[in-house]
């Protein structure tokens, strides 16, 4: 599957999806002495300009508020959440372009937590076009064992048999470049027997309410491990992708160094 097609799909491409170019209401106010703040609403998102620098505000899943800097080096994505429409008959969201044409694919992600039996034919008939299957993960503990998802093989084969396009994701806990290579090799070995035409995704994220073996990783570490994985996947002939939420993209990953890769933007 070509990169261009997946950017148009429900898996959103580059991370800064909330800052597409567009017009909006502009408000100006004085914030501190000799500082002027301009606020503009773009695609439903508040963009703040202060002292020539642009920022955006967002909330995490716990409704904590954050303000992050917009990076000139990171290309803007044209994805506009105001173009999402709910199909009341199916209950699915669709994404329509400016001409009203549906321009996104519907997909799901699954793992062992969805249970032992998934009726993949029913999934297909419901309008789902692609699936991202969890391949496995690296454990939190000191050993950091690599573990295959208990339902990986069954889910991949079932989805393929139903005619769905299939990608995979791997949850990383790498603490060195060597471990990132191990994770890459683990993933490539497991997908080799299958016709994987969707993205091969590196899932790197914050571990909430628990300790993690990655707690001492730096921004440079996390960013470098993404590169190691994505470059290895690309070299093997697959399409790499990085999974992360807005907070992780804004404050942990160095997005300006990852612009050649697609992102699966997580928002709940």
Q: Where do the protein language model's features map onto the residues?
A:
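Acidic-and-aromatic substrate-binding clefts and catalytic sites of carbohydrate-active enzymes
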Residues: 107-118, 136-151, 173-182, 247-251
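Sec-dependent signal peptide cleavage junction
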Residues: 19-35
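Conserved, mostly hydrophobic/aromatic
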Residues: 108, 123, 159, 202, ...
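Surface-exposed substrate-engagement region within the catalytic domains
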Residues: 190-198, 204-268
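Acidic (Asp/Glu)-rich catalytic clusters
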Residues: 100, 119-127, 149-164, 187-196
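Structural recognition of the beta-strand scaffold that forms the well-ordered cores
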Residues: 106-109, 129-134, 165-170, 198-204, ...
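N-terminal Sec-pathway targeting helices
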Residues: 1-12
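Boundary/entry segment of secreted carbohydrate-active catalytic domains
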Residues: 34-136
